[in-house]
């Protein structure tokens, strides 16, 4: 919650409690929340046990769920499919949990699509952090003393995070190559100035709601063979591929890292 949202909730009759220093990473100090009508609570356990509705970004721990009072509502990321223990803890405590990462990517739910908004930021920040850590500059630089070639960035996955990473890397002047197992993303990648790494198609690829639901092992092996050359020549590799409800696929193997450039 930001102070402006708190003002609306208070006006509607809600009592809003904010954990002390909760907004520091977003440049909101405690005073900005109290000015908006919220109460600052220093003790986390007291905050959790007092809430009828608890709003949180990252998934709570099982211990934190145990602090909540029975019948309370939890709204946060849960990643329930890969964190069944959290679901069990909510059931045991009598908590009604709304997993924001499970909201479908449809037009009616766009205003609640927090997964995409976070992925957008992650794609942008990944490039910025990578550029800062890289031992060379991104753009082509021509001077009287010589020419510095542009950096090459390889991005795995052309979803929300991947597309933002492409746009950011291109704006910084890098050469961008992108791999995604969904053929329909080729046009999106090229519209942002990226080069699409083509892998022969696989009729067994299943896509639902913009996400890949299944792909054969043979295709994944073929994809790794194709991208190995691109990764070995890259200055920066960013992986964004994600399968909802399952562990993110391992696309960059240790072997690829070993044959790649030392500074990748």
Give the location of each predicted region.
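Glycine-rich phosphate/diphosphate-binding loop of Rossmann-like nucleotide-binding domains
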Residues: 1-28, 139-230
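Conserved small/polar residues in nucleotide/adenosyl-binding loops
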Residues: 262-264
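A structured beta-alpha segment of the ubiquitous adenosine-cofactor-binding alpha/beta core
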Residues: 37-52, 59-60, 206-237, 241-256
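An N-terminal-biased, well-structured beta-alpha scaffold segment characteristic
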Residues: 1-89, 93
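Glycine/serine-rich phosphate-binding loop and adjoining beta1-alpha1 elements at the start
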Residues: 62-152
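Short, ordered loop/turn segments at secondary-structure junctions
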Residues: 21-23, 45, 59-60, 79-80, ...
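Short, well-ordered beta-strand core segments
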Residues: 54, 74, 195-196, 237
